[in-house]
Amino acid sequence: MQLLTLGINHHTAPLSLREKVAFPLEQLKPALGTLRQHLPHRKSTAEAAILSTCNRTELYCATDGNLPEDTAHEHAIRWLAHHHNIDAGELAPHVYALGQSQAVRHAFRVASGLDSMVLGETQILGQMKDAVRTATEAGALGTYLNQLFQRTFAVAKEVRGTTEIGAHSVSMAAAAVRLAQRIFESIAEQRVLFIGAGEMIELCATHFAAQKPRETVVANRTLERGEKLAEALSNQGLNARAVRLAELPARLGEFDIVVSCTASTLPIIGLGAVERAIKQRRHRPMFMVDLAVPRDIEPEVARLSDVFLYTVDDLGAIVREGNALRQAAVAQAEAIIETRVQNFMHWLDARSVVPIIRDLHAHAEALRQGELERAQRMLARGDDPALVLEALSQALTKKFLHGPTHALNHAQGEGREQLIDLLPGLFRQSSHSER
């Protein structure tokens, strides 16, 4: 069985490419179906899961396709490029393709927060669990990926429970507040707009709430969900309310700070809307953070002199400031992961002989059943039971030994020597187990 992991992330690809290969939630299940069909396979259907976040898009696959690892990865790259209507040549230089133990190690590191922009962050573990849940609902997981992800989650729990990998961590939300404080002397005097109402916006809202902004507004496509977040902020003593997303173009200029993170596949805020907002504000500065992938705010907005626009990649330098303090924890985590990778590979190696063992049992059962029926016929016609048992045992012995003796008689050269060394050990093992 081949394990494959293929993807791009913030280490290998710019935001402009990552947003092209992001998967909206509603596309994941159909995409899993076409991916599994595209992967090479023989007897069993390929298994697959897709992890898509603001910092990475990764395909986790298991296939029994008897192809070289490079060929299997080429199939996956072509599928990813075709699915998103981009040229495979544009994508390939930024893709990492990992097989077997490397794929396992990568999954363990990602879930443990070792591969994140925010070292040790916990959000990625929840995102990976969501990806597995979606793949399960789509019927895309089987024995191998199920086992991989169950062990992945166990390793992540062990790493976080026995090391300080999450200590001194600066989240993306906290980094957004720090950047805003560089622009405005006091956030308490500013009006803040949050676009979206998902987990990332909730985290950002919580961090900004600690600064007690003058006014907080939540704009969301679904007003009810925006009102729920606004109510939670009001309960923290803030002046908070919700508006519909459609109201943004006319009201954007009211806000000093804008934080956006939606699942939209197209920009929500265009250059023209921001230009009008700046004129309305009489060129007072506007701080904007776009945490969405694909982006919610057109990148051309960054060229406006009165706008300070930051993306997830721009926040990277700030969130990495505490990384040096966690290097000892990283070393501990890597040691744990390496041990668990070896454990998983032992399990995988053991699984590789399961089909052979199953076939051996099926063959032996067929021989046993055939001779048993023959013996029952002999007894039915009145043959001596002792002679029937003798005939049964002799027939079973001959048939069980036919395959090994035939192979030994017809083997030549090195193959014959290997059989001579192997067969006695197999039969000794069998006799030991009988005792």
Curated annotation (Swiss-Prot):
Instruction: Determine if NADP is one of this entry's keywords.
Output: yes
GO MF terms here are: glutamyl-tRNA reductase activity; NADP binding
Site feature: Important for activity: 106
Q: Which domain of life is it from?
A: Bacteria
From the UniProt record, give one GO term of the biological process aspect.
protoporphyrinogen IX biosynthetic process from glutamate
Give UniProt keywords alphabetically: NADP, Oxidoreductase, Porphyrin biosynthesis
- Reaction(s) catalysed by this chain's protein: (S)-4-amino-5-oxopentanoate + tRNA(Glu) + NADP(+) = L-glutamyl-tRNA(Glu) + NADPH + H(+)
CDD domains recorded? NAD_bind_Glutamyl_tRNA_reduct (cd05213)
Q: Which cysteines are joined by disulfide bonds?
A: none
Q: In which pathway does it act?
A: Porphyrin-containing compound metabolism; protoporphyrin-IX biosynthesis; 5-aminolevulinate from L-glutamyl-tRNA(Glu): step 1/2
Q: Which residues bind substrate?
A: 53-56, 116, 121-123, 127
Please name the InterPro entries in this protein's record.
4pyrrol_synth_GluRdtase, 4pyrrol_synth_GluRdtase_dimer, 4pyrrol_synth_GluRdtase_N, GluRdtase_CS, GluRdtase_dimer_dom_sf, GluRdtase_N_sf, NAD(P)-bd_dom_sf, Shikm_DH/Glu-tRNA_Rdtase
Q: Recorded E.C. number(s)?
A: 1.2.1.70
- Pfam families xrefs: GlutR_dimer, GlutR_N, Shikimate_DH
In this chain, NADP(+) is annotated as bound at 196-201
As a miscellaneous remark, the entry gives: During catalysis, the active site Cys acts as a nucleophile attacking the alpha-carbonyl group of tRNA-bound glutamate with the formation of a thioester intermediate between enzyme and glutamate, and the concomitant release of tRNA(Glu). The thioester intermediate is finally reduced by direct hydride transfer from NADPH, to form the product GSA.
> Which protein family is named in the record?
Belongs to the glutamyl-tRNA reductase family.
Describe the subunit structure: Homodimer.
Please state what the protein is called: Glutamyl-tRNA reductase
Q: Which organism is it from?
A: Ralstonia nicotianae (strain ATCC BAA-1114 / GMI1000)
